């Protein structure tokens, strides 16, 4: 059966000498794996069209199991996401988070909206690292956990100015007054905790201007990755390249 669906490539894996297996997140919020034959060959024209983040109309044959890609009518190549290694790595982290949050057969229209929103924001100049944080905050429940940043997990104190870190012992933010009860709590700035809470709760269609200092973004990114490792046992492939790039800077 010949299928035509709009979608965004969220995963691309080399298969053999000349083929690729791509996964698109289609406009209905479903993951669709496709075999792209000879996609690594320049002459086929599919090499550029099967890159990560390509948004387009995908035409493919679907019978049982994996479909076979025929062609792609590209709507947006998202070139800016490919031009900078840092940008590309954090955009990949966002895409990987969404891809791994979904089981085979899942239908999640919100994930498609989230991915489109994030890629458009990055293209317009918003920090890709910040956008990866937004995605990971929005996808937490799909990985089976949540996190609270707006009140002390020990005392219930919800005075934002008193919160100084995150406690894995008590599974939540911890206040200055209770800090002695967990000497291993991850110390965070008050602003980091506040913004994590805001971004977690704020609908994406209300996120207009996102201007946050890099130090705060770094703190948010670090604690979010720690949460995913601790609560979901997740380590993302994209994170390996990010870690390598950070080591090169040191």
From Swiss-Prot:
UniProt entry keywords in alphabetical sequence: DNA damage, DNA recombination, DNA repair
Q: Which domain of life is it from?
A: Bacteria
Determine if DNA repair is one of this entry's keywords: yes
The signal peptide, as residue positions, is: none
Entry's InterPro entries? Answer: ARFGAP/RecO (IPR037278), DNA_rep/recomb_RecO_N (IPR022572), NA-bd_OB-fold (IPR012340), RecO (IPR003717), RecO_C (IPR042242)
Q: Which GO terms describe its biological process?
A: DNA recombination; double-strand break repair
Q: Does the keyword Ribosomal protein apply?
A: no
GO cellular component labels: bacterial nucleoid
Classification via HAMAP family: RecO
Q: What does this protein do?
A: Involved in DNA repair and RecF pathway recombination.
Q: Which PANTHER family match?
A: DNA REPAIR PROTEIN RECO
The record's comment on protein family reads: Belongs to the RecO family.
State the name under which the record lists this protein: DNA repair protein RecO
Q: Which organism is it from?
A: Staphylococcus aureus (strain Mu3 / ATCC 700698)
Lineage at the top is: Bacteria, Bacillati, Bacillota, Bacilli, Bacillales
Gene behind this chain?
recO
């Amino acid at each position: 059966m010949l299928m035509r669906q709009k979608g965004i490539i969220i995963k691309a894996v080399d298969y053999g000498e000349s083929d690729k297996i791509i996964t698109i997140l289609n406009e209905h919020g479903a993951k669709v794996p496709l075999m792209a034959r000879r996609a690594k060959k320049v002459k086929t024209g599919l090499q550029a069209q099967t890159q990560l983040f390509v948004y387009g109309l995908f035409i493919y044959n679907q019978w049982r199991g994996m479909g076979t890609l025929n062609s792609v009518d590209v709507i947006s190549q998202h070139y800016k996401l490919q031009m900078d290694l840092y940008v590309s790595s954090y955009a990949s982290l966002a895409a990987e988070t969404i891809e791994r949050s979904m089981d085979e057969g899942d239908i999640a229209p919100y994930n498609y909206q989230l991915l489109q929103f994030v890629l458009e924001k990055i293209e317009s100049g918003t920090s890709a690292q910040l956008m990866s944080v937004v995605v990971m905050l929005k996808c937490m429940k799909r990985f089976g956990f949540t996190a609270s940043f707006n009140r002390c997990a020990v005392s219930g104190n919800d005075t934002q100015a008193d919160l100084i870190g995150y406690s894995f012992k008590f599974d939540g933010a911890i206040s200055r007054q209770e800090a002695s009860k967990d000497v291993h709590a991850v110390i965070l700035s008050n602003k980091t905790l506040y913004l994590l809470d805001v971004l977690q709760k704020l609908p994406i269609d209300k996120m207009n201007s996102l201007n946050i200092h890099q130090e705060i973004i770094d703190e948010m990114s670090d604690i979010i990755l720690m949460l995913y490792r601790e609560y979901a046992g997740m380590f993302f492939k994209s994170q390996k390249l990010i870690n390598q790039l950070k080591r090169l800077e040191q």
